[in-house]
Amino acid sequence: MGSEERQRLAQRAAWISLAATCVVVAVKLAGAALSGSISVLAEALQSILDVAMSAVVVWAVKVAAKPSDDDHPFGHSKAELLATAFQMLMALMVAGVIIWQAVPKLWAPTPIRPDWGLAAMGYAVVSNMIVAAWLRSTAKKTSATSLSGEAAHLVSDTMASVGILAGLLLYTFTQWTWIDPAAAILFTALGAVSVVKHIYQVV
């Protein structure tokens, strides 16, 4: 596969990832508003971060494709590394904010409507799994590290969504109101750990 073909594939994958994530954001925000679930809201905030990160990936892939010039005699490949570092930093910051907001709700929880949250999380899981698998495949073909970082973040988001689904199901059968904020804290923390691991892999 030639260099131009790899660049074209990487750019297309980045744009599709951005579009798919925008849809997931809309679905999760609707689910959070209708269910009143803080865990679903946390996932919606994570997905908003995904949109910002996907936009950065689109930029990084485009810049990395530029030929070398007088200011960049070795090309622009470092743009992807910078994009990956930015992705990881923003993910950790959002995780901290979510946990900070969810902890007080352990002691002051409120009833929720889990059906809307279940529908939103179910859609998010399926969408993210498909997009992440494609990004990984494209990253291997194109050697685009920013796509690899985006895929890793989507996998982390999917794991959190599965956990939120389980928590909402448990709430449905038990009506334990503390489950929702606990799920938000637990899976946000796990996502942060996944991000840190990916930093070491990239660096």
Task: List each model region and its residues.
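Alpha-helical transmembrane segments and adjacent TM-loop junctions that form the membrane-embedded core
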Residues: 2-17, 27, 33-35, 39-203
